[in-house]
Amino acid sequence: MEKQVYITEEERAKCKKVAEAFTELYEMADIVVVDVGRYGFVMLKYYMPPHGFEEDETYTDSRALFEGLWQEWLDMKLYLMAKGAPLLEKGYKGVFASLPEEKQSILIGRKADFAERAGIDL
């Protein structure tokens, strides 16, 4: 019986590069991306002992993995900026909108940095 493969070797190499580009995120939050072989890559989020991770998402497309990790990175940065302030009640979009334009530009500019490291064209 032949086992089904859900990700090509080419896409697997691209996903690996994307996952490696976001090491900064893994140090900021309880998030990790794991290569699960023929199944693709799994993003594990919010570790809660003794049960393990609260959420998981499986990726077989490097572009989708990049966008998922980018959104997690941006949300975490916005959360850390607004932590403990009533500003967080507005949600991440509200926090972002309340930032000065210069700070917004810096955050958005980081997406290009991550894309370059990950080999993703924006």
Question: Model segments located where?
Answer:
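Negatively charged, low-complexity tracts enriched in Asp/Glu with abundant Ser/Thr
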Residues: 1-29, 119-121
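Short, flexible active-site loop motifs that bind/organize anionic cofactors or intermediates
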Residues: 2, 54-56
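Flexible, glycine- and charge-enriched loops at secondary-structure boundaries
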Residues: 8, 55, 100
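Short, exposed beta-strand/loop patches in secreted or surface proteins that constitute
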Residues: 22-24, 32-36, 58
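Short aromatic-glycine-(Arg/Gly/Cys) micro-motifs in beta-strand/loop hairpins
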Residues: 29-53
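Alpha-helix N-cap recognition
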Residues: 61-62
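Mixed-charge, Lys/Arg-enriched low-complexity segments
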Residues: 68-122
